[in-house]
A protein has these predicted regions:
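Boundary regions of SH3-family modules and the immediately adjacent low-complexity/disordered segments
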Residues: 29-39, 64, 88-120
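SH3-family beta-barrel domains
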Residues: 25-57, 69-71, 78-81, 112-120
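N-terminal post-signal-peptidase region of extra-cytosolic proteins
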Residues: 57-65
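Bacterial N-terminal signal peptides that target proteins for export
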Residues: 2-13
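Bacterial N-terminal signal peptides
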Residues: 12-21
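Residue-level recognition of short, solvent-exposed, well-ordered loop/turn junctions
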Residues: 64, 70-73
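Short aromatic-glycine-enriched beta-strand elements
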Residues: 82-86
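N-terminal cationic leader/targeting segments used for protein routing and processing
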Residues: 5-6, 46, 63
Length: 120
């Protein structure tokens, strides 16, 4: 190799290594969104399922409900199983729910989410 080719190779390698230092892999939590498509909390009725999105212990309606999310709540998405997403309440009414523990995390049906970012 000539001196110019060696210098060019070293320069290219240095550039690749410098860019790699800034490349951060996507991690859980890089996907966020909001609850959409559920009735407003003014129409809340836990008995009939109105005005909230059920947070469940597993990815399906057959799993136990242990929390609620409400229209406009901000969520972080951590996992996906088909149409079901594992989410964490970040802000909104879910921090002070009508039923269940504050800031719930668990599985919700994806039809009621508007999400973006690097998602599972």
């Amino acid at each position: 190799m000539t001196f110019n080719k060696v210098a060019a190779s070293r320069s290219a390698l240095a550039t690749v290594l410098a860019l790699a230092a800034f490349a951060v892999p996507a991690i859980a939590g890089d996907c966020t969104g909001y609850v959409v498509g559920v009735r407003p909390v003014s129409q809340y009725n836990h008995a009939t399922g109105a005005g909230f999105l059920a947070v469940r212990s597993g990815p399906g309606s057959n799993y136990a409900q242990h929390g609620e999310l409400y229209l406009g709540d901000e969520i972080s998405v951590w996992d996906r199983n088909g149409s079901w997403y594992y989410v964490y309440c970040m802000s909104g009414r879910c921090t002070q729910p009508y039923w269940g523990q504050p800031t719930p995390q668990g599985w919700v049906y994806g039809k009621y989410l508007s999400i973006g970012g690097v998602c599972p």
